[in-house]
């Protein structure tokens, strides 16, 4: 009888942990990141000293607000890194400066060597 009760209690505890556990994958999708940053592609290919146009900042701000938890920020980082690798002639200095021009703080620098697992 005690063993049966212990087993039931263990099952309830496991179920509670599963229900309360965060999803293993962030809520941010690759397509969401891509569509938010697509207007910026031409800008990050050049040596742009001029301020970023407002529509670029809108996409960056929407990504920032969508990345509320660490897993989302890591997922966004991975997507940004993947997108940047696919853009020919990307100027990483311009890309890294874009969030700052938009007054958006992200917890990492956009670069090909970023370790997205370390993003907090």
UniProtKB/Swiss-Prot annotation:
Protein name stated in the entry: Non-specific lipid-transfer protein 6
Cysteine pairs bridged by disulfides in the record: 57-102, 77-116
Entry's family note: Belongs to the plant LTP family.
InterPro entries per the UniProt record, alphabetical: Bifun_inhib/LTP/seed_sf, Bifunc_inhib/LTP/seed_store, Plant_nsLTP
Span of the signal peptide: 1-26
Stated role: Plant non-specific lipid-transfer proteins transfer phospholipids as well as galactolipids across membranes. May play a role in wax or cutin deposition in the cell walls of expanding epidermal cells and certain secretory tissues.
Keyword field: Disulfide bond, Lipid-binding, Signal, Transport
Coiled coil stretches, renumbered: none
Pfam family of the protein (one): Tryp_alpha_amyl
Tissue: Specifically expressed in fiber cells.
GO molecular function: lipid binding
GO biological process: lipid transport
């Amino acid at each position: 009888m005690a063993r049966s009760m212990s087993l039931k209690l263990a099952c309830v505890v496991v179920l509670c942990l599963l229900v309360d556990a965060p999803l293993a994958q962030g809520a941010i999708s690759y397509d969401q990141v891509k569509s938010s940053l697509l207007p910026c592609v031409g800008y990050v290919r050049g040596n742009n000293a001029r301020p970023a146009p407002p529509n670029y900042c809108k996409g960056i701000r929407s990504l920032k607000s969508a990345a509320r938890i660490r897993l989302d920020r890591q997922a966004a980082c991975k997507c940004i890194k993947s997108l940047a690798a696919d853009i020919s002639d990307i100027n990483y200095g311009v890309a890294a400066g874009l969030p700052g021009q938009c007054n958006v703080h992200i917890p990492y620098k956009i670069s090909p060597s970023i370790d997205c697992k370390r993003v907090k």
